[in-house]
């Protein structure tokens, strides 16, 4: 019996090819048992097993032989197995990434929103910056412009990254990074996203910074946007595809 078809990586890992997995659980169990012994004898450290959802009936057999869940996607489950005890297995994604836009018009008014789903309707609106989570593979500058437009109807131009907050214990045991960006509005007519946003308006900056119902954090990040030069998007000629990488650097560097 041959080992299940696989590739390897430079870290001593074996990556089982999903297309090489049999449909029958009993056949898979026998092949997997033989393969693990073979890979262990060859000195590999870790096995990565991606099971397509169409072959999910194989998962039980993998778990029975010592595989552990690592992460999942819409159409697959990734499992891992340590051929050598205590071999390092890198964790899956550790962070969520979000961005908020500081959008100020020529009248020194700040674009703010209050979310619809925030508990009691008796509380005053909790005004904050428009923004939200980045999509998979989306650039930060693109995401914050998109989120501002989706929530408020305001088209905006990305100017610079101002500051960010790093928060542990956010959701499902992961951490969260929230980037604060300065944007220039290209129009001023608000078209509110009714599904998520209860209130959306242009608020005088002074009123926002003095308001009791605006959190200290939200005031501070707006102050940072007003006072900090921040870092701007740039490109590096000797680097890889700009569609895959995004750089923010102080302006004026040679």
Residue ranges and their predicted role:
Residues 128-161, 181, 186-189:
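The catalytic Nudix box helix
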Residues 49-56, 134:
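Conserved beta-strand-loop-alpha-helix junction that forms the acyl-donor binding cleft
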Residues 57, 64-98:
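Long amphipathic N-terminal alpha/beta scaffold segment
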Residues 40-51:
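Conserved GNAT acetyl-CoA-binding A-motif
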Residues 2-11, 15, 19-30, 38, ...:
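Nudix hydrolase/Nudix homology domain
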Residues 78-80, 112, 180-182, 202:
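Conserved hydrophobic/aromatic beta-strand scaffold that supports enzyme active sites
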Residues 83-127, 156, 160:
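N-terminal strand-loop-strand
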């Amino acid at each position: 019996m041959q080992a299940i078809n696989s590739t390897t990586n430079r870290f001593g890992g074996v990556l089982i090819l999903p297309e090489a997995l049999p449909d029958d659980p009993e056949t898979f169990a026998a092949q997997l048992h033989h393969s693990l012994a073979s890979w262990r004898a060859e000195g590999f450290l870790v096995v990565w097993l991606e099971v397509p959802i169409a072959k999910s009936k194989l998962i039980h057999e993998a778990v029975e032989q010592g595989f552990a869940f690592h992460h999942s996607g819409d159409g697959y489950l990734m499992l891992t197995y340590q051929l050598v005890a205590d071999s390092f297995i890198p964790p899956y994604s550790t962070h969520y990434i979000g961005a908020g836009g500081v959008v100020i018009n020529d009248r020194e008014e700040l674009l703010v929103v209050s979310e619809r789903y925030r508990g009691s309707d008796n509380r005053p609106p909790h005004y904050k910056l428009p923004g939200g989570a980045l999509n998979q593979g989306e650039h930060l500058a693109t995401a914050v412009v998109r989120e501002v437009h989706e929530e408020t109807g305001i088209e905006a131009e990305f100017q610079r990254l101002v500051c960010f907050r790093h928060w542990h214990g956010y959701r499902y045991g992961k951490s969260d990074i929230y980037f604060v960006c300065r944007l220039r509005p290209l129009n001023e007519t608000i078209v509110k996203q009714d599904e998520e946003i209860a209130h959306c308006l242009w608020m005088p900056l002074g009123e926002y910074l003095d308001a009791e119902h605006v959190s200290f954090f939200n005031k501070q990040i707006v102050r940072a946007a007003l006072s900090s030069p921040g870092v701007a998007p740039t490109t590096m000629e000797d680097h890889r595809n700009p569609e895959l990488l995004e750089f923010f650097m102080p302006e004026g560097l040679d």
